[in-house]
Amino acid sequence: PAPKMLDALIIGAGFAGLYQLHLLRDRQKLDVLVLEAADGVGGTWYWNRYPGARCDSESWSYCLQFDDALVRDWRWTERYPRQPEILRYLNHVADRFDLRSHIRLNTRVSEAQFEEASDSWLVTTATGEQYRARFLIAAVGCLSAANIPNIPGLGDFKGRWYHTGEWPHEGVDFTGKRVGQVGTGSTGIQSAPVIAADAA
């Protein structure tokens, strides 16, 4: 069977994907679908669960501004909220505006081709499902893939190593462990004191 023609297809259900879904579906009245690789909404804030993860911008800047009641009703508990609170906020947005009904979770896009003959995008998922859309919005963000550095000898390392962009959702027990850290960006600064509190 030929794939159904959508008005728009959005890749990613983080801040940008949720907002675009609301804008295109609810305001523009378009037939829209979001494809999300994770099993939940949140984008960066779904994937990045490393110890100490939090925003480094004030909480008010994380409020979607398209609805006065949404802005009024949500109360951040901290000036710089932690990852779990930001993820709760995004789930709140998805529920409040019934966005989940137009989101397919656990669906990774493997290919997108623009076909001039039909003036549309043909999008294929990792399982071979296909979707066709007049408009394609890649809302995958700049942090959707871990930037794993090419460190000589990493493949020979006998211990465990973790990247903050691929942190296990069940967490890591560092109690009594010797831990080394590479990197002192905002993620490193957030995670180091939390890990150090448990490590040897």
Walk through the language-model features, giving the residues of each.
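Glycine-rich dinucleotide-binding loop and its adjacent helix/turn
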Residues: 69-76, 82-86, 140-198
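Feature captures the FAD/FMN-dependent oxidoreductase FAD-binding
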Residues: 76-143
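A short beta-to-alpha transition loop/helix N-cap that caps and shapes the active-site region
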Residues: 41-46, 145
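N-terminal Rossmann-like FAD-binding beta1-loop-alpha1 element of flavoenzymes
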Residues: 3-34, 188-196
